[in-house]
């Protein structure tokens, strides 16, 4: 499945990721109140969803930021845009 994130990052992701229990758990963990749990869940989601595209994703986000940093907010926004597309695929 081809996706384009909110920031404009384009990549292919495995459509079968919707069947991976680890992603379901990570999405649920991302809703918890504990910030450390949420961060760990975001890391897991990036790795599960993007796989080999993870470093290219970070480089893309870095290039979009004037300070050349990868912000937590940018990661969160892009993950949300991908997850929304995945949810639409499941429905």
Label each residue range with its predicted role:
Residues 10-13:
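Short, isolated positions in well-ordered beta-strands
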Residues 1-8:
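Short acidic-hydrophobic surface loop/beta-edge motif
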